[in-house]
């Protein structure tokens, strides 16, 4: 399974105006045998009590006005509401929820982010965790929205590109939404394990370096991600 981001799709930070986007879509879908959804590049799949929602943050991107587009956002809302998975991983190329971001981020679309958040609250959808990349470093972000269980965004990258450190003068250097000791500006990848009794499931997030050594671990319990009535 795979999704794309800007460098798989086009040039750096490319959006929906990229003139070769249909060529990119055709090549990507020929290379990756993903489940298709109306010939577009987003889909969902489930393994046991875990479901993944794989998003396209490029094809309909309008530089922070929209990232997903109405059609994909409506699809995501419908699929989330229909899911009975204990953990629901929303996977997106760019970071999802970083209020301090100086780069591309779904949170900065404002309207799409708020629309999705309001829907999650209204439908009392449990178990959502975001998985993202793009930033050339790793970190785990935690955002507490009003009336909502904590939202996590587990960002990893790079695996093959060069790492980039956040400068000390950058407002993200001391990001208050970053969980302590999770920032890692070197080659990395993640491992996710879901274990435990079905009524008391636990999700273990692990960050590893390029040799496979664990850099840090963080556990999230099913009961930590229950929507409030």
Predicted features and spans:
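Metal-dependent phosphoester/phosphodiester hydrolase catalytic core
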Residues: 1-229
């Amino acid at each position: 399974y795979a999704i794309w981001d800007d460098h798989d799709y086009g040039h750096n930070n490319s959006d929906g105006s990229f003139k070769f986007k249909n060529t990119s879509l055709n090549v990507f879908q020929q290379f990756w045998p993903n489940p298709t959804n109306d010939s577009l590049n987003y889909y969902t799949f489930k393994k046991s009590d875990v479901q993944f929602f794989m998003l396209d943050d490029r094809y309909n991107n309008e530089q922070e006005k929209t990232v997903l587009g109405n059609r994909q956002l409506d699809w995501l809302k419908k699929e989330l509401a229909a899911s009975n998975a204990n953990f629901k991983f929303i996977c997106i190329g760019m970071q999802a929820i970083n209020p301090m971001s100086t780069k591309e981020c779904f949170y900065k679309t404002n309207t799409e982010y708020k629309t999705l958040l309001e829907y999650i609250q209204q439908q009392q959808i449990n178990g959502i965790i975001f998985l993202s990349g793009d930033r050339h470093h790793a970190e785990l972000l935690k955002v507490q929205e009003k009336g909502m269980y904590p939202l996590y965004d587990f960002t990893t990258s790079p695996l093959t590109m060069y790492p980039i450190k956040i400068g000390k003068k950058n407002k993200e250097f001391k990001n208050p939404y970053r969980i302590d000791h999770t920032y890692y500006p070197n080659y990395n990848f993640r491992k996710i394990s879901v274990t435990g009794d079905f009524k008391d499931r636990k999700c273990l997030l692990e960050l590893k370096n390029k040799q496979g050594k664990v850099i840090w671990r963080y556990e999230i319990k099913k009961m930590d991600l229950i929507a409030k009535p």
